[in-house]
Amino acid sequence: MTNILKLNAISPLADEIFKNCNYGDKVENPDGIMVRSAAMADYKVGENLIAVARAGAGTNNIPVADYTQKGIVVFNTPGANANAVKELVICELFLGGRKITDAIDWVKTLKGEGDSVGKLVEKGKSSFVGGEIFGKTLGVIGLGAIGIAVANAASALGMKVVGCDPFLSTANALMLSPAVKVVPSREEVYKCADYVTVHVPLTPDTKGMFNAETIALMKGGAVLINNSRGELADADAVISALECGKLARYITDFPSDKLIGVKNAICVPHLGASTPEAEDNCALMAAKQLVDYIENGNIVNSVNYPALSAPKEGAARICVHHKNVANMIAQFTAAVSSAGLNIENMADKSKGDFAYCIIDVNAKPAPELAKTIAAIDGVIKVRVI
């Protein structure tokens, strides 16, 4: 029986997907792991572990590079929480344009004023006048599942939307509203946007992308929304921009000690995907991908290995994780041929320095074949299903 360990509370909808597995939070030496936010840097990897499924988009809590070297596939669930995050961003657009949070805090100070509350409200409300988002320009950095959803929703609310994504796929481009203008550079977005929202992963290239230099390119009084990762923004630069009025608001789903309590900084306690619907969607998607890989060797939505899936066409499937170097395929086919097997179907794809190969054969191979392939220089892991 397949052993699946969950490191966090996972939606019970995943239970049905794992009904034929030993699934729970006390499982030892697992074949697969389900995780949300648990830090895995110090997790001791057992000899059976072949995959980790993150019920969410970000994988910063998982040592992806180390797992890649070990042939452990890391999955995520892009788009499963897109609607939840989109709705939070739309909420934050209103919070950024109108001084709603300040006004709510002020109203709380009127407790105990009795019948005078109404008059005090009418007298004091002018301090909290804000602008509408209709007709304003929203800049969207990153046009993946969430960025597209935000762009389309904002356009439907009457905003002018400008987006930028150097990696925009044809499929994603077709999902964008025709009213959304795509430009080639972030700088073009910064210069025209009244609001800027970012939806990109945290990488060495994106860390600190919102700094003094980039904020200086923005319109005076712009609102910056960051629901992706706190490290995308230089907190000191943001605070300086808020103090001088270059930024009217900074709204983030990732509070930090520096930002908490800063005037015009709104820190939301990481609520982007915190809806029952998003948690269900992420859990189901992660569970299905994990089971499909364990049972069929198919890889869908992996952050460290290439997407490769195909229906089984033989009596057995040989799955090989290997370095992306020359002459690997020839050595695999030679080993299969030497074992007296016919190849019914074969596919190999690469992602950076690593690659993945599936070989469907006409009969179940003897254990020696897996050992022969594993001994080839550059092979990381071999599995026969």
PLM segments and residue spans:
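Phosphate-binding beta-alpha-beta segment of Rossmann-like dinucleotide-binding domains, i.e.
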Residues: 78-137, 301-302
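An N-terminal-biased, well-structured beta-alpha scaffold segment characteristic
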Residues: 1-77, 191, 211-213, 217, ...
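N-terminal Rossmann-fold NAD(P) dinucleotide-binding loop
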Residues: 147-148
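Rossmann-like dinucleotide-binding domain for NAD(H)/NADP(H)
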Residues: 212, 220-312, 321-323, 356, ...
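A conserved regulatory-domain signal marking ACT and ACT-like small-molecule sensing domains
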Residues: 300, 304-385
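Oxidoreductase and adenylate-handling cofactor-binding alpha/beta cores
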Residues: 86-105, 152-159, 284-298, 333-337
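Rossmann-like adenosine-cofactor binding region
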Residues: 38-43, 166-258, 274
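Glycine-rich Rossmann-fold phosphate-binding loop(s) that bind the pyrophosphate
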Residues: 143-144
